[in-house]
A protein has these predicted regions:
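Generic protein-terminus/edge-of-domain signal
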Residues: 1-67, 73, 80
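Short amphipathic alpha-helical leader/targeting segments
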Residues: 69-70, 85
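Short hydrophobic-aromatic micro-motifs
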Residues: 74-76, 105
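A hydrophobic/aromatic-rich effector-binding and dimerization subdomain
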Residues: 2-12, 16-25, 81-120
């Protein structure tokens, strides 16, 4: 699985249009240069784990703002509106792993998915 640049395009409701991975392997890894282009407000049906790989990141999700120092991470649940910006002027890079909930929870009807993933 390659690390790709993420170009976030959304529909009028803010839903990201990018397909993350494939039906057989629904996971993708991205790198974003926030100095060049912040990640705009968007949401998707996948889970996302992001890590500030260089510089500080201001991340917003579910109505909260989070300051991430280099090496810090944040988990974003499916369907949550979120965005990312550089914390200060200068180099700012973000790595993210975006994956479908069925990779960890199985079916949306499973006890694991309903009890542990959906409440997050």
């Amino acid at each position: 699985m390659a690390l790709s640049a993420c170009n976030t395009e959304t529909d009028s409701a803010g839903r990201e249009l990018t397909v993350h991975g494939t039906a057989a392997f629904p996971i993708a890894c991205y790198h974003d240069d926030l100095e060049a282009a912040p990640v705009p407000w968007h949401w998707h049906e996948e889970l996302e784990l992001l890590i500030a790989s260089e510089g500080g990141v201001l991340a917003a999700a579910a109505g909260e703002k989070y300051t991430l120092a280099e090496g810090d991470g944040l988990f974003i649940n499916a369907g949550v509106l979120h965005a990312d910006w550089p914390l200060a002027v200068g180099r700012c890079r973000l790595h993210s792993v975006v994956f479908h909930p069925r990779l960890v929870g199985g079916s949306p009807d499973s006890v694991f998915c309903q009890k542990y993933l959906q409440p997050l």
